[in-house]
Amino acid sequence: MAGSVFGNIFKISTWGESHGEGLGVVIDGCPAGLPLCEKDIQEQLDRRKPGQSKFTTPRKEDDEVHILSGVFEGKTTGTPISLAVYNKTQRSADYSEIANYYRPGHADYTFDEKFGFRDYRGGGRSSGRETIGRVAAGAIAMKILKELGINITAYAKEIGGIGIDYDKFDIAERDNNAFNMPDKEAAEKVKAFAESKMSVGDSIGGVIECRVTGMMTGIGNPTFEKLDANLAKAIMSIGAVKGFEIGDGFEAAKVTGKYNNDEFVMKDGRVGKLTNHSGGVLGGISDGDEIVFRAAVKPTPSISALQETVNKQGEDIEVSIKGRHDPMIVPRAVVVVEAMTALTLVDLIFDNMTARMDRVKEFYRK
């Protein structure tokens, strides 16, 4: 299967299935000398692991990471880093009946059309558990960014149509509720709404917003490797994501150029902007301002409510999906968005090291 590799210089390859022996990732292109231990990675994996509240899948997994290669005496060696997480509580029998029909909203039908075969247990390769490898690799990328003074923060901006109030925005509150929302009142409203949908076997979606601070200027390229285009590709590669916008996004289509243009001014001896409608990217290249983008996350397709579908014999049938599923994926997808953002930024930052001859000469000057 092609399409499991992401990145050009800081490159990752994820592997594994939801109900296989395990999942993981191989990272190639990480510099030697980065302090790294399993705890650094585990902290991020713990943010996405299942079973943390009644609003996520009840499947319980420790998701304990094992570093198999690329680290010696607490530092990266510059060789490929291999990370593995072993599945422990898979219940494949829950999925035996879906082998013969296509679940609405899932990749069952398209997998069969493309490969002529599919691992129906929990979605196989298209399961949300595939993101374990992304988050594990993203933890390493975030350590690199931290060394450069760059910080990534994502949160649930909206769930089930209930949005946060920016006047009540408190990022510390994000970790105090089950929804990763930085607004306590909004989280309480989501709780009530989610419970009402769960009671009838339905699910809900939402919007994740991500902010990058400390970003230097000049990262990205003007054509096919644009910073915003690469971010869009990275975020849209997350299974549940169906939309992406950066800066003012689609709202920019409703205003004039006079309003949309970010006017330049001098700030503390450097070029700055009066506004940030662009979301920190101009011409595919970072402008030094905060990078702000949003991702639309669809409702979890696995629901127990009765739905119409088709089986492999071409017959119309009605189904109710069994198994352990998330009534919403937004809260657990927040850390995945952060991880894919980190991977994109590190890859482009490393790419930028050869953009200017004067800097190449400065680097190698003895």
UniProtKB/Swiss-Prot annotation:
Key word Flavoprotein present: yes
GO BP annotations listed: amino acid biosynthetic process; aromatic amino acid family biosynthetic process; chorismate biosynthetic process
Entry-linked Pfam families: Chorismate_synt (PF01264)
InterPro entries xref list: Chorismate_synth, Chorismate_synth_AroC_sf, Chorismate_synthase_CS
Reactions mediated catalytically: 5-O-(1-carboxyvinyl)-3-phosphoshikimate = chorismate + phosphate
Sequence positions that bind NADP(+): R48
Pathway field: Metabolic intermediate biosynthesis; chorismate biosynthesis; chorismate from D-erythrose 4-phosphate and phosphoenolpyruvate: step 7/7
A GO term from the CC aspect: cytosol
Ion transport among keywords: no
EC number: 4.2.3.5
Cofactor: FMNH2
Binding-site residues for FMN, renumbered to this chain: R125, S126, S127, G283, K298, P299, T300, P301, S302, R324
GO molecular function terms listed in the Swiss-Prot or TrEMBL record: chorismate synthase activity; FMN binding
Disulfide bonds: none
UniProt cofactor note: Reduced FMN (FMNH(2)).
Keyword set, alphabetical order: Amino-acid biosynthesis, Aromatic amino acid biosynthesis, FAD, Flavoprotein, FMN, Lyase, NADP
Subunit structure: Homotetramer.
PANTHER family tied to this protein: CHORISMATE SYNTHASE
Chain's role: This reaction introduces a second double bond into the aromatic ring system.
Homology family: Belongs to the chorismate synthase family.
Protein name, UniProt field: Chorismate synthase
Organism: Lachnospira eligens (strain ATCC 27750 / DSM 3376 / VPI C15-48 / C15-B4) (Eubacterium eligens)
